[in-house]
Amino acid sequence: MTNNKLILAIETSCDETSVSVIKNGTELLSNTVLSQIDSHKRFGGVVPEVASRHHVEGITATIDESLVSAKVKMEDIDAIAVTQGPGLIGALLIGINAAKALAFAYDKPIIPVHHIAGHIYANHLEQPLTFPLMSLIVSGGHTELVYMKNHLDFEVIGETRDDAVGEAYDKVARTINLPYPGGPHIDRLAAKGKDVYDFPRVWLEKDSYDFSFSGLKSAVINKLHNLRQKNIEIVAEDVATSFQNSVVEVLTYKAIHACKTYNVNRLIVAGGVASNKGLRNALSEACKKEGIHLTIPSPVLCTDNAAMIGAAGYYLYQAGLRGDLALNGQNNIDIETFSV
């Protein structure tokens, strides 16, 4: 008799079809990711209908591949975790319907998982979470600060009021003719450029932990437009450096300030933008100076993947959370509703 629990996790919230098998919330047995980046590049961003069609085409094979990689069968699985939201509703439904079909066919419980909770728990796959902690979520669709006193205890203390940081990266990248996704390209150029443009830092109200990147995005676009009107040469590396420094300074300051205010000495970072080298370096230096323990997952666990959904799903399963065959996707759902 064993107490080991195997979670089959499914993630289809945006443009990655991913399936993973996780043992006891920490041991990664498989993590299969089918990326759609090449399909969306020509459009300069994710096209929801195209994403949904790719999920339909790839979900069955991805499930099969993940089970084979983990060397388990569906009969061995204890529960099926699936991203309920937030995300593209059509994309979410592909994963949810696959999870419901498996749950019905094999009589397995369904565990609905919040996408951002998954990003947070990606850290747990490499280093056990210790509490209390502050989590900085930085991705294409989200920029948030989440305070946690314990497992599955989510308190959002700050969030973006307009553009998410990853969205701002992609839009600025487009203005200097960089391909999608723009974040990695800006990060690469920023390492070679100079901070010559005085782009704004948006702090909002005193002691606010919210973020705003639409003003910065507009400032960059307007600056480039004016330079082109005057036939002044634009150095893409300098634009990237100046833009990224503005973003990183705000993210770092607010994350450190939140840790101090809430008296926590552990900061974790989650989401696709967490793989940004400029941000990782700035946070590392600031946390070292302030005596804060910093955890950032490996780049492969920063982007969307099912392993993170399985890690969070394991704790939701242990806490008794269950979905049913009426489970539906939600394109906008509060992470605090998943607190237990």
Curated annotation (Swiss-Prot):
GO terms for molecular function: iron ion binding; N(6)-L-threonylcarbamoyladenine synthase activity. Substrate binds at I137, V138, S139, G140, G141, D170, G183, D187, N276. Fe cation binds at H115, H119, D304. Binds 1 Fe(2+) ion per subunit. Belongs to the KAE1 / TsaD family. It catalyses: L-threonylcarbamoyladenylate + adenosine(37) in tRNA = N(6)-L-threonylcarbamoyladenosine(37) in tRNA + AMP + H(+). It holds the Pfam family TsaD. Its EC number is 2.3.1.234. InterPro entries: ATPase_NBD, Gcp-like_dom, KAE1/TsaD, Peptidase_M22_CS, TsaD. Keywords: Acyltransferase, Cytoplasm, Iron, Metal-binding, Transferase, tRNA processing. It is an enzyme of class 2 (transferase). This is tRNA N6-adenosine threonylcarbamoyltransferase. Required for the formation of a threonylcarbamoyl group on adenosine at position 37 (t(6)A37) in tRNAs that read codons beginning with adenine. Is involved in the transfer of the threonylcarbamoyl moiety of threonylcarbamoyl-AMP (TC-AMP) to the N6 group of A37, together with TsaE and TsaB. TsaD likely plays a direct catalytic role in this reaction. NCBIfam families: gcp_kae1, T6A_TsaD_YgjD. It comes from Staphylococcus epidermidis (strain ATCC 35984 / DSM 28319 / BCRC 17069 / CCUG 31568 / BM 3577 / RP62A).
